[in-house]
A protein has these predicted regions:
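Short, well-ordered alpha-helix to beta-strand connector turns
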Residues: 59-60, 107
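Short beta-alpha junction loops
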Residues: 69, 93-100
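Structural motif corresponding to alpha-helix initiation and N-cap regions
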Residues: 46-49, 77, 113
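C-terminal helix of von Willebrand factor
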Residues: 109-123
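Glycine-rich, charge-decorated loop segments at or immediately adjacent to ligand/cofactor-binding or catalytic sites
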Residues: 97-111
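Conserved N-terminal substructure of TIR/SEFIR domains
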Residues: 1-58, 86-88, 94-95
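Conserved TIR/SEFIR loop-to-helix hotspot centered on a Trp-containing motif
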Residues: 68-85
Length: 123
């Protein structure tokens, strides 16, 4: 494999443990991607959106970890909208096996290595 793809992870802060699992996958030496984390625990500072947009523009794709928490996560919704505005491909991955929340405008699949790999290979 040539260069690793850069993947921006959009997630609700309540799903940080799931993000950590995905991060762990990206640290696997055979993983076809590296990830960018822009999570914030404090209210967004004034230039947060500019920094996020810059990082999304530098990314090959965005993986949105989708859960019931996504429905009320203004930061995650903004990141997804930003990716759409910048023409960056997005794939939703359900964060939990027992949660099939539908996030409008995001094509979402079950969290499997093959589904993640297929998305990354399509970039």
């Amino acid at each position: 494999m040539a260069d690793k793809k850069v993947i921006f992870i959009a997630f609700a802060i309540e799903d940080v443990k799931q993000r950590d699992l995905l991060k762990g996958q990206s640290l696997n030496t055979k993983s076809p991607f590296e990830y960018i984390d822009m999570s914030v625990k404090e209210p967004y500072d004034k230039d947060w959106k500019d920094r996020v947009r810059t990082r999304i523009k530098r990314s090959d794709g965005v993986i949105a970890l989708v859960s019931k928490n996504s429905l009320k996560s203004s930061g995650q919704k903004w990141e997804i909208q930003c990716a759409k505005e910048e023409g960056i491909k997005i794939r939703g991955i359900w964060a939990y096996s027992d949660d099939r929340t539908d996030l409008e405008g995001v094509y979402t699949k079950v969290w499997t290595w093959d589904n993640i790999k297929d998305f990354i290979d399509s970039l």
